């Protein structure tokens, strides 16, 4: 079943997103979560269906959370995903001899 979803970006946490059903807007999101999330900034709307793939979230989990609790919170990736690992030869290239 297809769902029209609004996706909001957190101003406090980089890469944290809140998925809600467009018809419900933010009415089903707990106040405590909104307090931690910060004032939601609308990013975009999206049609979700079981066939659709999302970049970092499992579509079945997102749809289930939207049906059961009215929202889905996408957490930022773990910090090690941000770190680019460089070879040792590049790390010590400018070291004094």
From Swiss-Prot:
It comes from the Bacteria. This is YcgL domain-containing protein Pmen_1774. InterPro entries: YcgL-like_sf, YcgL_dom. It holds the Pfam family YcgL. Residues 3-87 form the YcgL domain. HAMAP family: UPF0745.
